[in-house]
Amino acid sequence: MTIKSWTVSDELWAKVEPLIPAQKREQQREYLREPGGGRKPLDRRKVFEGIVYVLRTGCQWKALPEERFGSASSIHKYFLAWQRAGVFVQLWRKGLAEYDAMEGIAWAWQSIDGSMVKAPLAQEAVGPNPTDRGKNGSKRSLLVDANGIPLSIVASGANVHDVKLLEPTLDQIVVKRPPVQAPLTEALCADNGYAGQPAKQAIELRNYVPNVRGRRDENVEKRNEPGKRARRWVVERTHSWLNRYRKLLVRFEKKLVSFEGLLELACALIVFRRVTVIYG
């Protein structure tokens, strides 16, 4: 029997469930209905599976199979509420903690790069895509460790230069970075989009050793040192992992909060695939 990639395993649900906020009533208000009355709330696990279903398949929220997951509009409301409560970034953080405990976050070689996607309906963090004839697009700036595990992600308009996203991406690592002492031991790999003195200063200010290489430089190094591979490719591979979540291939979310929620959940699932079985 084929396991569907949106069927959440018991192992993953055990990580998610404690993060979901309980529904609370305001102390100062008086309610006509007693607690527990009214329509029965949706099963939280089914709600989470519905969110993963949308993320994996790329379908519209209103196209969710109601017979499997329940009300599509309710699931979307839960998604927004959980995003505002920080559920997805907490899940990502928990995954990184388990990954660190299991084999250690590979801080020594980190890589950063941006990737652009179409965003025809976006109203926030959107701009003309210079590689798509000026059509609306968004960019995600991604930082990964040496194994391609995502550490930070920032969304912006497609017309924002990678260098302008360098500092926000480095400053928004979702777990605490270990203190770095001299001599510096953590390298940051990037392509020529991050060349120049301002980027170099920003990298060094955060105690990284800049390792900025263009493809031409990498080709020369490969000829001189056969068998040597560029370390920057790992971030490009992680961008391709993100693209397997089809809801991220084209951004249809109007609001930034929705887009960020999908990005954070995708990053969390990528991390957990490293440490446990997530589909079941």
Report each predicted region and the residues it spans.
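Short alpha-helical elements
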Residues: 1-280
